[in-house]
């Protein structure tokens, strides 16, 4: 489904939170949305492999990487795994790498920056916890909508159709 965050803000301005404009699109989908699962991990993406093994239909993985752009949390291998398991999208408060490969995949990916250095894979981090960045607090189960204009968040799903 295609989302227009500008239109959604016009319709639901009282019901949505708008994330500060820190992110760029790196995925093959220009818009995406779904119920979020939150993860907090700093320069380590080991936990993400297990999460992307889950069925991602209707889901978006929201990663709080502490805003670090020193190491990429998402690479082509992880994004392919997410695509295979039907994840709608990924939002990274941090960096990605292998951006040409990411752009070829049918998944939405928003991140702060790209860098060629990969993350560690110790599995250090937490999932399904409250995270805060971009002026918004995110909880697993909230609904996120993203396009090239921005990212918005709603406690409940928005009536799009």
Swiss-Prot record:
Q: What is an annotated GO biological process for this record, any one? A: negative regulation of RNA catabolic process
InterPro entries membership: RraA, RraA/RraA-like, RraA/RraA-like_sf, RraA_gpbac
Major place of localization?
cytoplasm
The entry lists its GO molecular-function terms as:
endoribonuclease inhibitor activity; enzyme binding
Q: What does this protein do?
A: Globally modulates RNA abundance by binding to RNase E (Rne) and regulating its endonucleolytic activity. Can modulate Rne action in a substrate-dependent manner by altering the composition of the degradosome. Modulates RNA-binding and helicase activities of the degradosome.
Q: List the HAMAP family.
A: RraA
> Subunit structure, per the record?
Homotrimer. Binds to both RNA-binding sites in the C-terminal region of Rne and to RhlB.
Similarity comment? Belongs to the RraA family.
Q: What is this protein called?
A: Regulator of ribonuclease activity A
Organism classification, top ranks?
Answer: Bacteria, Pseudomonadati, Pseudomonadota, Gammaproteobacteria, Enterobacterales
